[in-house]
Amino acid sequence: DAQEKRQPWLPFV
């Protein structure tokens, strides 16, 4: 997914 890469943080890291 590109959504997690556009975010500066990871809510599901």
Curated annotation (Swiss-Prot):
Could you confirm whether the keyword Secreted appears in this record?
Answer: yes
Q: Does the keyword tRNA-binding apply?
A: no
Location within or outside the cell: Secreted
Q: Name one GO biological process term.
A: defense response
- Where does the protein principally reside? secreted
Q: Which residues carry this modification: Valine amide?
A: V13
Q: Which GO terms describe its cellular component?
A: extracellular region
Entry comment describing in which tissues the protein is expressed: Expressed by the skin dorsal glands.
Q: Which UniProt keywords apply?
A: Amidation, Amphibian defense peptide, Secreted
Assigned protein family: Belongs to the frog skin active peptide (FSAP) family. Peroniin subfamily.
Q: What protein does this entry describe?
A: Peroniin-1.3a
